[in-house]
Amino acid sequence: MQPTDTMKRTMAEVVAQRRTEMSPGRIFAEACAAKGTDAVVEYDVTITDSLTSSRRKPRYPARNMIKVVDLSKDPRRYYWHESLPDPGAPQVHEADLRREAANRFHRSPVPELLPTTAWVQVPPDLWEDIETFESFINYRLIVRLSTAENDTIIRGAGGLLNMPQIARMTSRGSFSSTILAACNEVEQMGGTADGLIINPADYYAFMGEGRLMDDIERNGVFIVRTRLVEPGTALVGDFGHGALLFDAGRSVIRFAEPPPGTFAEPGGLALMAQIHERVVVNLPTNFFVVSL
């Protein structure tokens, strides 16, 4: 597993490369200048993975925690996963020491990818200023798409929090926090707890009370702060080896009619961005939803 400082250097290299490329917003803004509201741009990348942030304080999306499988470049039929042994299953040699030795192995088909969609209302004539329209697409439409993607990965119909095979942990045992207890439990299963998804309210409460968040991050745990985890809970797991994000490797931006209730005020031009993806867990025994 990469140390946090190595991961940050790698991200800096990615940022430097992306600054030399045309942004998704620029591509669409130029298409709109040429075709007006008939403009449709289909990208051969997932656009939530193609933007860089100018923020001095990063806030990472959930997709950055998980190995992404771009099915357009790396087609798959199946994925493997494990489960705990059935009650009464035969004893496995040294499973009391190496718990994972008793796990069962499975093969499942790659599930149907789910659409993730975001909408914005375009202020009148904004597209006439290409630079401003580019910024609006990049930092409103695609940022909203990133939020919708977090929902797909974390709490949507196929999201991590809705997977019944991921256990809940309410007791911290001999540790000072259930987060640390879960990290230990993952390692007792032969994995490494390399990721934490936590509500900002709890993240900053821990910051004010002590050094837990700093200690966890210095220990190499990648932290995602998001409203999509209920306050008082967090998700701890082996994201690097224990989960996959299947990705279509395709995106689209176009003008379209939004569903009712999308905006506070009806009317005006609506712009839609959409991607397709699905998260799966290979090692559900290496994830815990903890009560803080």
Map each language-model feature to its residues.
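Extended oligomerization regions of viral-like shell subunits
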Residues: 157-277
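Structural signal for terminal/edge beta-strands and the immediately following C-terminal loop/tail
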Residues: 275-292
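A generic N-terminal leader/anchor concept
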Residues: 1-31
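Short loop/turn segments at secondary-structure transitions that flank enzyme active sites
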Residues: 84-87, 126, 147, 151, ...
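Helix N-cap / beta->alpha transition motif
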Residues: 42-48, 123, 198-202, 225, ...
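Alpha-helical scaffold segments that mediate packing/assembly in large oligomeric complexes
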Residues: 94-189, 288-292
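Short conserved micro-motifs at the rims of enzyme active sites and ligand-binding pockets
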Residues: 89-91, 132, 207-210, 233-236, ...
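Assembly/oligomerization interface modules of large self-assembling protein complexes
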Residues: 25-116
